[in-house]
From Swiss-Prot:
Species the sequence originates in: Shigella boydii serotype 4 (strain Sb227)
Protein name, per record: Uroporphyrinogen decarboxylase
Annotated metabolic or biological route of this protein: Porphyrin-containing compound metabolism; protoporphyrin-IX biosynthesis; coproporphyrinogen-III from 5-aminolevulinate: step 4/4
Function: Catalyzes the decarboxylation of four acetate groups of uroporphyrinogen-III to yield coproporphyrinogen-III.
CDD domains: URO-D (cd00717)
Location within or outside the cell: Cytoplasm
Subunit field text: Homodimer.
Binding locations of substrate: 27-31, 77, 154, 209, 327
Reactions listed under catalytic activity: uroporphyrinogen III + 4 H(+) = coproporphyrinogen III + 4 CO2
Family in the record: Belongs to the uroporphyrinogen decarboxylase family.
Keyword Zinc: no
Origin: domain of life: Bacteria
Length: 354
Protein backbone atom coordinates (compact mmCIF):
# COMPACT_ATOMS: atom_id res chain seq x y z
CA UNK A 1 0.00 0.00 0.00
CA UNK A 2 1.41 3.40 -0.99
CA UNK A 3 1.55 5.69 2.02
CA UNK A 4 -0.13 8.98 1.13
CA UNK A 5 1.61 12.08 2.42
CA UNK A 6 -1.65 14.06 2.21
CA UNK A 7 -4.87 12.06 2.47
CA UNK A 8 -7.21 14.81 3.68
CA UNK A 9 -9.26 14.66 0.45
CA UNK A 10 -10.00 10.93 0.98
CA UNK A 11 -10.64 11.47 4.69
CA UNK A 12 -13.10 14.30 4.04
CA UNK A 13 -15.02 12.16 1.51
CA UNK A 14 -15.40 9.50 4.22
CA UNK A 15 -16.41 12.19 6.77
CA UNK A 16 -13.31 11.56 8.88
CA UNK A 17 -11.42 14.31 10.77
CA UNK A 18 -9.09 16.62 8.81
CA UNK A 19 -6.93 19.60 9.82
CA UNK A 20 -8.26 21.93 7.09
CA UNK A 21 -10.91 21.59 4.37
CA UNK A 22 -9.35 19.90 1.32
CA UNK A 23 -9.65 21.64 -2.04
CA UNK A 24 -9.23 20.83 -5.72
CA UNK A 25 -10.78 22.36 -8.85
CA UNK A 26 -12.74 20.74 -11.63
CA UNK A 27 -10.69 21.17 -14.83
CA UNK A 28 -7.69 22.21 -12.70
CA UNK A 29 -5.46 20.90 -15.51
CA UNK A 30 -6.49 23.12 -18.38
CA UNK A 31 -6.42 26.12 -20.64
CA UNK A 32 -6.24 28.80 -17.92
CA UNK A 33 -2.62 27.67 -17.32
CA UNK A 34 -0.01 28.94 -19.81
CA UNK A 35 2.05 25.76 -19.30
CA UNK A 36 -0.96 23.65 -20.33
CA UNK A 37 -1.17 25.52 -23.63
CA UNK A 38 2.49 24.73 -24.32
CA UNK A 39 1.98 20.98 -23.69
CA UNK A 40 -1.25 20.96 -25.67
CA UNK A 41 0.55 22.53 -28.66
CA UNK A 42 3.25 19.88 -28.32
CA UNK A 43 0.60 17.11 -28.47
CA UNK A 44 -1.03 18.57 -31.59
CA UNK A 45 -4.66 18.15 -30.57
CA UNK A 46 -6.78 17.39 -27.53
CA UNK A 47 -7.27 13.62 -28.02
CA UNK A 48 -3.55 13.15 -28.82
CA UNK A 49 -2.86 14.79 -25.46
CA UNK A 50 -5.26 12.37 -23.73
CA UNK A 51 -3.72 9.37 -25.51
CA UNK A 52 -0.08 10.15 -24.66
CA UNK A 53 0.50 8.90 -21.09
CA UNK A 54 3.57 11.10 -20.48
CA UNK A 55 1.88 14.29 -21.70
CA UNK A 56 -1.41 13.47 -19.90
CA UNK A 57 0.68 12.98 -16.75
CA UNK A 58 2.49 16.28 -17.30
CA UNK A 59 -0.75 18.30 -17.57
CA UNK A 60 -2.25 16.44 -14.58
CA UNK A 61 0.73 17.53 -12.45
CA UNK A 62 0.96 21.15 -13.69
CA UNK A 63 -1.66 22.65 -11.32
CA UNK A 64 -0.06 20.79 -8.37
CA UNK A 65 3.24 22.55 -9.03
CA UNK A 66 1.50 25.91 -8.77
CA UNK A 67 -1.01 25.36 -5.97
CA UNK A 68 -1.14 23.27 -2.75
CA UNK A 69 -4.11 21.23 -4.04
CA UNK A 70 -5.27 18.20 -2.07
CA UNK A 71 -5.94 15.91 -5.05
CA UNK A 72 -4.90 15.33 -8.64
CA UNK A 73 -7.51 14.39 -11.24
CA UNK A 74 -6.71 12.25 -14.24
CA UNK A 75 -6.41 14.34 -17.39
CA UNK A 76 -8.84 12.75 -19.82
CA UNK A 77 -12.29 13.34 -21.30
CA UNK A 78 -15.73 11.89 -20.57
CA UNK A 79 -16.10 10.95 -24.26
CA UNK A 80 -13.33 8.33 -24.21
CA UNK A 81 -15.96 5.59 -23.66
CA UNK A 82 -18.21 6.45 -26.66
CA UNK A 83 -15.05 6.94 -28.72
CA UNK A 84 -13.93 3.41 -27.78
CA UNK A 85 -17.36 2.12 -28.86
CA UNK A 86 -16.48 3.23 -32.39
CA UNK A 87 -18.62 6.35 -32.83
CA UNK A 88 -15.81 8.34 -34.45
CA UNK A 89 -15.09 11.23 -32.08
CA UNK A 90 -13.65 14.40 -33.56
CA UNK A 91 -13.49 18.04 -32.47
CA UNK A 92 -14.94 20.81 -34.63
CA UNK A 93 -13.29 24.23 -34.14
CA UNK A 94 -15.70 26.37 -32.11
CA UNK A 95 -18.28 23.54 -32.06
CA UNK A 96 -16.80 21.16 -29.51
CA UNK A 97 -17.01 17.35 -29.75
CA UNK A 98 -18.84 15.63 -32.63
CA UNK A 99 -19.44 11.99 -33.60
CA UNK A 100 -19.35 10.76 -37.19
CA UNK A 101 -21.81 7.89 -36.44
CA UNK A 102 -24.41 8.98 -33.86
CA UNK A 103 -26.80 6.42 -32.35
CA UNK A 104 -30.24 6.77 -33.96
CA UNK A 105 -32.14 3.56 -33.11
CA UNK A 106 -32.11 0.23 -31.24
CA UNK A 107 -30.25 -1.47 -34.13
CA UNK A 108 -27.40 1.04 -33.67
CA UNK A 109 -27.32 0.28 -29.94
CA UNK A 110 -27.17 -3.48 -30.57
CA UNK A 111 -24.07 -3.03 -32.73
CA UNK A 112 -22.13 -1.11 -30.05
CA UNK A 113 -19.37 -3.09 -28.32
CA UNK A 114 -18.66 -2.85 -24.58
CA UNK A 115 -15.04 -1.61 -24.69
CA UNK A 116 -12.28 -3.52 -22.92
CA UNK A 117 -10.72 -0.92 -20.60
CA UNK A 118 -7.23 -2.45 -20.90
CA UNK A 119 -7.47 -2.65 -24.70
CA UNK A 120 -9.41 0.14 -26.45
CA UNK A 121 -9.06 2.33 -23.35
CA UNK A 122 -5.60 1.09 -22.42
CA UNK A 123 -4.16 4.57 -22.99
CA UNK A 124 -6.27 5.85 -20.06
CA UNK A 125 -4.96 3.09 -17.77
CA UNK A 126 -1.39 3.85 -18.88
CA UNK A 127 -1.97 7.50 -17.95
CA UNK A 128 -3.35 6.48 -14.52
CA UNK A 129 -0.31 4.27 -13.83
CA UNK A 130 2.12 6.96 -15.02
CA UNK A 131 0.47 9.69 -12.91
CA UNK A 132 0.41 7.49 -9.79
CA UNK A 133 4.12 6.79 -10.23
CA UNK A 134 4.99 10.46 -10.72
CA UNK A 135 2.79 11.68 -7.83
CA UNK A 136 5.04 9.69 -5.45
CA UNK A 137 2.25 9.56 -2.86
CA UNK A 138 1.99 13.36 -2.53
CA UNK A 139 -1.82 13.50 -2.99
CA UNK A 140 -4.50 11.02 -4.12
CA UNK A 141 -5.46 10.59 -7.78
CA UNK A 142 -9.10 10.90 -8.81
CA UNK A 143 -10.39 8.82 -11.72
CA UNK A 144 -13.66 9.66 -13.45
CA UNK A 145 -16.25 8.94 -16.09
CA UNK A 146 -19.30 10.62 -17.54
CA UNK A 147 -22.66 9.22 -16.43
CA UNK A 148 -24.59 6.96 -18.84
CA UNK A 149 -27.22 9.68 -19.43
CA UNK A 150 -24.63 12.38 -20.12
CA UNK A 151 -22.63 10.12 -22.47
CA UNK A 152 -25.87 9.13 -24.24
CA UNK A 153 -26.73 12.80 -24.90
CA UNK A 154 -23.53 13.20 -26.94
CA UNK A 155 -23.94 9.83 -28.67
CA UNK A 156 -27.55 10.43 -29.74
CA UNK A 157 -27.29 14.16 -30.44
CA UNK A 158 -24.06 13.59 -32.38
CA UNK A 159 -22.25 16.10 -30.16
CA UNK A 160 -23.01 18.99 -27.82
CA UNK A 161 -26.59 20.23 -27.60
CA UNK A 162 -28.56 23.15 -26.20
CA UNK A 163 -32.13 21.80 -26.30
CA UNK A 164 -31.55 18.01 -26.22
CA UNK A 165 -34.50 17.45 -28.57
CA UNK A 166 -32.94 14.46 -30.37
CA UNK A 167 -32.30 12.40 -27.24
CA UNK A 168 -35.60 13.49 -25.68
CA UNK A 169 -37.37 12.36 -28.85
CA UNK A 170 -35.77 8.92 -28.37
CA UNK A 171 -36.61 8.99 -24.64
CA UNK A 172 -40.32 9.62 -25.24
CA UNK A 173 -40.86 7.94 -28.64
CA UNK A 174 -38.56 4.91 -28.25
CA UNK A 175 -37.69 4.52 -24.56
CA UNK A 176 -36.61 0.90 -25.07
CA UNK A 177 -33.80 1.97 -27.39
CA UNK A 178 -32.57 4.55 -24.88
CA UNK A 179 -32.75 2.11 -21.96
CA UNK A 180 -30.74 -0.42 -24.02
CA UNK A 181 -28.10 2.26 -24.68
CA UNK A 182 -27.98 3.39 -21.04
CA UNK A 183 -27.69 -0.20 -19.84
CA UNK A 184 -24.74 -0.84 -22.18
CA UNK A 185 -23.13 2.41 -21.03
CA UNK A 186 -23.62 1.53 -17.35
CA UNK A 187 -21.81 -1.79 -17.92
CA UNK A 188 -19.04 -0.04 -19.88
CA UNK A 189 -18.57 2.70 -17.26
CA UNK A 190 -18.46 0.16 -14.40
CA UNK A 191 -15.68 -1.78 -16.16
CA UNK A 192 -13.89 1.47 -17.05
CA UNK A 193 -13.92 2.89 -13.50
CA UNK A 194 -12.93 -0.43 -11.94
CA UNK A 195 -9.99 -0.61 -14.35
CA UNK A 196 -8.98 2.94 -13.33
CA UNK A 197 -9.14 1.87 -9.66
CA UNK A 198 -7.01 -1.23 -10.35
CA UNK A 199 -4.53 0.95 -12.27
CA UNK A 200 -4.21 3.27 -9.25
CA UNK A 201 -7.10 5.77 -9.01
CA UNK A 202 -7.74 6.27 -5.27
CA UNK A 203 -11.20 7.84 -5.64
CA UNK A 204 -13.65 8.10 -8.54
CA UNK A 205 -16.20 10.62 -9.66
CA UNK A 206 -19.19 10.27 -12.01
CA UNK A 207 -19.99 13.46 -13.91
CA UNK A 208 -23.66 13.77 -14.82
CA UNK A 209 -23.30 17.09 -16.61
CA UNK A 210 -26.71 16.99 -18.31
CA UNK A 211 -28.92 15.26 -15.71
CA UNK A 212 -30.37 18.65 -14.81
CA UNK A 213 -32.22 18.95 -18.16
CA UNK A 214 -34.61 16.15 -17.13
CA UNK A 215 -37.89 16.18 -15.21
CA UNK A 216 -37.69 14.60 -11.75
CA UNK A 217 -39.32 11.35 -12.90
CA UNK A 218 -37.14 11.09 -16.00
CA UNK A 219 -34.02 11.85 -13.94
CA UNK A 220 -34.83 8.88 -11.67
CA UNK A 221 -35.48 6.50 -14.60
CA UNK A 222 -32.93 7.58 -17.19
CA UNK A 223 -30.04 8.98 -15.16
CA UNK A 224 -30.00 8.13 -11.45
CA UNK A 225 -31.06 4.49 -11.92
CA UNK A 226 -28.00 3.82 -14.10
CA UNK A 227 -25.60 5.72 -11.82
CA UNK A 228 -26.93 3.60 -8.95
CA UNK A 229 -26.14 0.45 -10.98
CA UNK A 230 -22.58 1.68 -11.47
CA UNK A 231 -22.10 2.49 -7.77
CA UNK A 232 -23.34 -1.03 -6.94
CA UNK A 233 -20.75 -2.55 -9.29
CA UNK A 234 -17.69 -0.53 -8.26
CA UNK A 235 -14.67 -1.81 -6.35
CA UNK A 236 -14.98 0.01 -3.04
CA UNK A 237 -11.64 -1.07 -1.63
CA UNK A 238 -8.21 -1.34 -3.21
CA UNK A 239 -4.67 -1.47 -1.87
CA UNK A 240 -6.04 -1.74 1.69
CA UNK A 241 -7.99 1.51 1.47
CA UNK A 242 -11.59 2.48 0.80
CA UNK A 243 -12.14 4.02 -2.66
CA UNK A 244 -14.69 6.84 -2.27
CA UNK A 245 -17.23 7.55 -5.00
CA UNK A 246 -18.64 11.03 -5.73
CA UNK A 247 -21.74 11.65 -7.86
CA UNK A 248 -22.20 15.05 -9.47
CA UNK A 249 -25.36 16.06 -11.33
CA UNK A 250 -25.13 19.62 -12.60
CA UNK A 251 -28.52 21.22 -11.93
CA UNK A 252 -29.42 18.33 -9.61
CA UNK A 253 -29.79 20.20 -6.32
CA UNK A 254 -33.46 19.23 -5.99
CA UNK A 255 -32.60 15.49 -6.04
CA UNK A 256 -29.87 15.27 -3.38
CA UNK A 257 -31.87 12.92 -1.13
CA UNK A 258 -32.39 10.42 -3.96
CA UNK A 259 -28.73 10.69 -5.00
CA UNK A 260 -27.57 10.06 -1.42
CA UNK A 261 -29.55 6.78 -1.42
CA UNK A 262 -27.32 5.27 -4.12
CA UNK A 263 -24.61 4.28 -1.66
CA UNK A 264 -22.11 6.84 -2.96
CA UNK A 265 -19.79 8.53 -0.44
CA UNK A 266 -20.17 12.13 -1.59
CA UNK A 267 -22.28 14.43 -3.73
CA UNK A 268 -20.91 17.24 -5.87
CA UNK A 269 -22.93 20.46 -5.72
CA UNK A 270 -23.15 23.11 -8.40
CA UNK A 271 -23.21 26.76 -7.35
CA UNK A 272 -27.01 27.08 -7.53
CA UNK A 273 -27.48 24.89 -4.43
CA UNK A 274 -27.05 26.40 -0.98
CA UNK A 275 -24.46 24.26 0.84
CA UNK A 276 -26.03 24.85 4.28
CA UNK A 277 -29.35 23.58 2.93
CA UNK A 278 -27.63 20.60 1.27
CA UNK A 279 -25.89 19.68 4.53
CA UNK A 280 -29.17 19.87 6.48
CA UNK A 281 -30.79 17.56 3.93
CA UNK A 282 -28.12 14.89 3.35
CA UNK A 283 -25.06 15.71 5.49
CA UNK A 284 -25.69 12.80 7.84
CA UNK A 285 -25.39 10.38 4.90
CA UNK A 286 -22.78 11.72 2.48
CA UNK A 287 -19.93 14.21 2.22
CA UNK A 288 -20.45 17.30 0.05
CA UNK A 289 -18.15 18.75 -2.59
CA UNK A 290 -18.35 22.32 -3.82
CA UNK A 291 -19.52 24.77 -4.59
CA UNK A 292 -18.22 28.23 -5.56
CA UNK A 293 -19.42 29.69 -8.85
CA UNK A 294 -16.42 29.29 -11.22
CA UNK A 295 -17.07 32.85 -12.47
CA UNK A 296 -16.23 34.16 -8.98
CA UNK A 297 -12.56 33.67 -9.97
CA UNK A 298 -12.89 36.76 -12.19
CA UNK A 299 -13.52 38.84 -9.04
CA UNK A 300 -10.79 40.74 -7.12
CA UNK A 301 -8.92 38.60 -4.55
CA UNK A 302 -10.75 40.10 -1.55
CA UNK A 303 -14.12 39.15 -3.07
CA UNK A 304 -12.91 35.59 -3.77
CA UNK A 305 -11.84 35.26 -0.13
CA UNK A 306 -15.20 36.60 1.05
CA UNK A 307 -17.02 33.98 -1.05
CA UNK A 308 -14.80 31.19 0.28
CA UNK A 309 -15.56 32.36 3.85
CA UNK A 310 -19.32 32.41 3.11
CA UNK A 311 -19.33 28.84 1.75
CA UNK A 312 -17.18 27.54 4.63
CA UNK A 313 -19.55 29.17 7.13
CA UNK A 314 -22.51 27.69 5.24
CA UNK A 315 -21.14 24.18 5.65
CA UNK A 316 -20.09 24.98 9.22
CA UNK A 317 -18.07 22.97 11.74
CA UNK A 318 -17.25 19.32 11.38
CA UNK A 319 -16.26 16.88 8.70
CA UNK A 320 -17.42 15.91 5.25
CA UNK A 321 -16.67 18.95 3.06
CA UNK A 322 -14.37 19.00 0.03
CA UNK A 323 -14.10 22.52 -1.35
CA UNK A 324 -14.36 22.87 -5.11
CA UNK A 325 -15.93 25.04 -7.77
CA UNK A 326 -19.53 24.31 -8.76
CA UNK A 327 -18.30 23.31 -12.24
CA UNK A 328 -15.08 23.53 -14.28
CA UNK A 329 -12.73 26.51 -14.03
CA UNK A 330 -13.09 28.91 -16.99
CA UNK A 331 -10.23 29.07 -19.47
CA UNK A 332 -9.63 32.83 -19.18
CA UNK A 333 -9.40 33.04 -15.37
CA UNK A 334 -6.12 34.62 -14.13
CA UNK A 335 -4.04 31.74 -12.65
CA UNK A 336 -3.18 33.96 -9.64
CA UNK A 337 -6.89 34.11 -8.74
CA UNK A 338 -7.02 30.30 -8.59
CA UNK A 339 -4.06 30.54 -6.19
CA UNK A 340 -5.94 33.04 -3.99
CA UNK A 341 -8.90 30.62 -3.91
CA UNK A 342 -6.87 27.55 -2.87
CA UNK A 343 -4.87 29.45 -0.23
CA UNK A 344 -8.05 31.02 1.22
CA UNK A 345 -9.77 27.63 1.59
CA UNK A 346 -6.90 26.23 3.66
CA UNK A 347 -6.36 29.35 5.76
CA UNK A 348 -10.01 30.15 6.48
CA UNK A 349 -11.18 26.58 7.10
CA UNK A 350 -8.85 25.74 9.97
CA UNK A 351 -11.28 27.21 12.54
CA UNK A 352 -13.98 24.72 11.47
CA UNK A 353 -11.85 21.66 12.26
CA UNK A 354 -10.75 22.40 15.84
Amino acid sequence: MTELKNDRYLRALLRQPVDVTPVWMMRQAGRYLPEYKVTRAQAGDFMSLCKNAELACEVTLQPLRRYPLDAAILFSDILTVPDAMGLGLYFEAGEGPRFTSPVTCKADVDKLPIPDPEDELGYVMNAVRTIRRELKGEVPLIGFSGSPWTLATYMVEGGSSKAFTVIKKMMYADPQALHALLDKLAKSVTLYLNAQIKAGAQAVMIFDTWGGVLTGRDYQQFSLYYMHKIVDGLLRENDGRRVPVTLFTKGGGQWLEAMAETGCDALGLDWTTDIADARRRVGNKVALQGNMDPSMLYAPPARIEEEVATILAGFGHGEGHVFNLGHGIHQDVPPEHAGVFVEAVHRLSEQYHR
